[in-house]
C-alpha cells in the first residue's frame, strides 16, 4: 500500500509517503521553532494558523519527493491525538478531505504509538518489548505485545522529561527549545559537579517525577549566580542531564529485568539526547538486552512514523472512516481496549 501520512499534533507540519508501512519514499517536516522561540514555548493558536498556511505545501512536497501523483495514494494516516486540539484538527480535516476526494480509506493514529513503532522503519524489532516514550509532553513506560496492544506500566506524575529540559533551559536564560542546547553544553561539563536529586528513583514502581529536580536546579542557580557563565554553566547542564538520564535508565532497567522482556525501544524527541542514548546503550550491554533507538529524524515529530500503525490498521480494516475527530488526550491503553481505533 502507498500511504500518505499527515502529522500536525504540535508545532511541526509534516507529510510522508511510505510503501507497505516500511519503505520511506519521502518524509517532509516544516518546523515552527523559530516562530515560537520568541514566546519561549509553543503558542497553540499560532501553531494552528501556521499549520493551515503550510500543510498543503508540505503534502505537495512529500508527493514530489516520492515522485508520485496524488492519485497513486491508496490510503491516508493522520495523527488523531494526543496533541493540541486546534493543531490536530488541521491535519484531520485535510486528511478527510483528501480521502473523500480520492475515494480512499483514512485512519487516525496515536502520536505516541507512532513514536514507539517508528523504529520499525529502520529495524526488524520483534514483539514483545518494553518501550520508553520520552518527549516534551510524555514520559511513559509501556509493555508492547503487538501493534494495538499496549499496557502502561509507568508514567510521569508531573512534568515530562522533555518539558523539564525546556523549563530548566528557560530558567537559565537559554533560548527555546532548550533541550538540545543543554545536551551540547553538557558535553563540555562535569556530570558529577552538582548532586541534584533523583526523584522516585529508589521507589518500587516505574513512575517518574521531574518537577522537584527542576526546582532544585532553580534554587541552585539563584544561590549561585556565577553558575550561569562559562564552564560553570556547562557543569549545571551536565549535572541536570545526568540526573534525568539516571532516573530514566533506572526505571527502564527495573521494567526490563522484572518483566523478563530483554528487548527495549526508546522513542520520542528526548531519545535524541546523546547522554540518554549513551547511558541506555551501556545499560543494555550490561544486562544483555536488545536496544533499539530510532535515528534522530525519526525520534522527533515526523509523518513517516505514522505509516507503521497506519498501514497495519488499514490493511486489517481497522479504519476510523470520515467520522474520526481529534482526541487531545488519548492514552495508549485506550487503543488496546478498543482493538485499535
From Swiss-Prot:
Cofactor binding, per record: Binds 1 Fe(2+) ion per subunit.
Cofactor: Fe(2+)
Binding site for substrate: 133-137, 166, 179, 183, 273
Any GO BP: tRNA threonylcarbamoyladenosine modification
Record Pfam families: TsaD (PF00814)
Residues engaged in binding Fe cation: 111, 115, 301
UniProt keyword annotation of DNA-binding present: no
Gene Ontology MF terms in the entry: iron ion binding; N(6)-L-threonylcarbamoyladenine synthase activity
Cell compartments where the protein resides: Cytoplasm
Protein EC: 2.3.1.234
HAMAP family on file: TsaD
Chain's role: Required for the formation of a threonylcarbamoyl group on adenosine at position 37 (t(6)A37) in tRNAs that read codons beginning with adenine. Is involved in the transfer of the threonylcarbamoyl moiety of threonylcarbamoyl-AMP (TC-AMP) to the N6 group of A37, together with TsaE and TsaB. TsaD likely plays a direct catalytic role in this reaction.
Protein name: tRNA N6-adenosine threonylcarbamoyltransferase
Gene source species: Geotalea daltonii (strain DSM 22248 / JCM 15807 / FRC-32)
Organismal lineage: Bacteria, Pseudomonadati, Thermodesulfobacteriota, Desulfuromonadia, Geobacterales
Amino acid at each position: 500500500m502507498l500511504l500518505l501520512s499527515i502529522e500536525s499534533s504540535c508545532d511541526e507540519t509534516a507529510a510522508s509517503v511510505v510503501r507497505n508501512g516500511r519503505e520511506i519514499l519521502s518524509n517532509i517536516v516544516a518546523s515552527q521553532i523559530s516562530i515560537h522561540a520568541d514566546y519561549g514555548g509553543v503558542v497553540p493558536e499560532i501553531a494552528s494558523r501556521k499549520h493551515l498556511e503550510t500543510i498543503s505545501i508540505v503534502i505537495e512536497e512529500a508527493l514530489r519527493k516520492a515522485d508520485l501523483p496524488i492519485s497513486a495514494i491508496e490510503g491516508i494516516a493522520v495523527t488523531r491525538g494526543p496533541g493540541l486540539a486546534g493543531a490536530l484538527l488541521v491535519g484531520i480535516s485535510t486528511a478527510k478531505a483528501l480521502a473523500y476526494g480520492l475515494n480512499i480509506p483514512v485512519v487516525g493514529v496515536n502520536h505516541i504509538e507512532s513514536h514507539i513503532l517508528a523504529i520499525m522503519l529502520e529495524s526488524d524489532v520483534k514483539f514483545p518489548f518494553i518501550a520508553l516514550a520520552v518527549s516534551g509532553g510524555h514520559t511513559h513506560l509501556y509493555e508492547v505485545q503487538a501493534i494495538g496492544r499496549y499496557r502502561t506500566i509507568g508514567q510521569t506524575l508531573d512534568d515530562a522529561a522533555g518539558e523539564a529540559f525546556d523549563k530548566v533551559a528557560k530558567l537559565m536564560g537559554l533560548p527555546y527549545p532548550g533541550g538540545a542546547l543543554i545536551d551540547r553544553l553538557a558535553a563540555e561539563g562535569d556530570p558529577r559537579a552538582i548532586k541534584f536529586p533523583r526523584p522516585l528513583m529508589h521507589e518500587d514502581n516505574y513512575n517518574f517525577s521531574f518537577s522537584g529536580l527542576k526546582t532544585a536546579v532553580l534554587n541552585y542557580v539563584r544561590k549561585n549566580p556565577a553558575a550561569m557563565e562559562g564552564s560553570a554553566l556547562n557543569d549545571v547542564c551536565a549535572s541536570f542531564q545526568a540526573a534525568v538520564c539516571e532516573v530514566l535508565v533506572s526505571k527502564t532497567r527495573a521494567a526490563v529485568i522484572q518483566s523478563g522482556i530483554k528487548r527495549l525501544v526508546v522513542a520520542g524527541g528526548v531519545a535524541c539526547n546523546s547522554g540518554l542514548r549513551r547511558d541506555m546503550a551501556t545499560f543494555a550491554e550490561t544486562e544483555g538486552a536488545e536496544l533499539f533507538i530510532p535515528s534522530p529524524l525519526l525520534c522527533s515529530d515526523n509523518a513517516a512514523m505514522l505509516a507503521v500503525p497506519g498501514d497495519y490498521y488499514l490493511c486489517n480494516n481497522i479504519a476510523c472512516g470520515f467520522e474520526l475527530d481529534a482526541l487531545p488526550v488519548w492514552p495508549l491503553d485506550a487503543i488496546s481496549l478498543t482493538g485499535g481505533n
